[in-house]
């Protein structure tokens, strides 16, 4: 299995958010039935420390903005948000600005909007699972299987979590469409 262990990715995001000063987080999940996204949120709170605080924001950008703004208004002590997807992160950023809150924003996955938010400082980091590796590594495994007496790796091959932030966004963005 090649991929990103979502619970571990969330945990690493929570640990980093905690190290960056977050004390009261909120996880925005656009697909509450999607166990991978729930794992991201549960992992975030495992790393951050504290009880799970996850809301279903739907996949509709207007709903994401409205529900995020409502959550921030209802609990001004929220100082960290993890968005479980890139479009959620962009909508959360707008809600944070609309409410006038100061909130540490972290994301999952890459998009043009997330790239811009990392460059501007609106988002602290995103977790990149390197989708190209998820497609490339199985080819290598199949080649080895066919040329090495049917031998397979003994464990999962993680492609993430990897952090993208202001320190490496330009390098990562330059690889978009080539190696990422």
What are these regions (language model features)?
Residues 47-51, 133-180:
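Hinge/cleft segment of the Venus flytrap/periplasmic-binding protein
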Residues 24-32:
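Short beta-strand segments enriched in small/hydrophobic residues
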Residues 44, 53, 57-117:
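Hydrophobic alpha-helical
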Residues 9-13, 32-52, 67, 91, ...:
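Short, solvent-exposed amphipathic alpha-helices that sit
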Residues 1-25, 62-65, 111-114, 129-149:
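Hydrophobic alpha-helical segments within soluble ligand-binding/sensing domains
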Residues 116-124:
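CN hydrolase (nitrilase-like) catalytic-core segments centered on the catalytic cysteine
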Residues 23, 79, 124:
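Conserved acidic residues
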């Amino acid at each position: 299995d090649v991929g990103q262990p979502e619970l571990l990715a969330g945990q690493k995001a929570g640990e980093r958010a905690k190290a960056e000063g977050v004390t009261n987080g909120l996880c925005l999940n656009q697909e509450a039935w999607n166990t991978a996204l729930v794992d991201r949120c549960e992992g975030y709170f495992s790393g951050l420390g504290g009880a799970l605080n996850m809301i279903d924001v739907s996949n509709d950008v207007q709903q994401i903005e409205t529900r995020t703004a409502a959550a921030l208004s209802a609990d001004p002590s929220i100082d960290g948000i993890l968005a479980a997807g890139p479009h959620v992160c962009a909508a959360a950023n707008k809600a944070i600005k609309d409410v006038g809150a100061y909130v540490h924003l972290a994301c999952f996955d890459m998009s043009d909007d997330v790239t811009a938010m990392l460059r501007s400082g609106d988002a602290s980091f995103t977790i990149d699972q390197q989708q190209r590796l998820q497609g490339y590594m199985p080819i290598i495994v199949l080649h080895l299987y066919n040329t090495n007496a049917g031998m397979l790796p003994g464990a999962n091959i993680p492609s993430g979590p990897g952090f993208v932030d202001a320190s490496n966004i330009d390098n990562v963005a330059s690889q978009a469409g080539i190696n990422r």
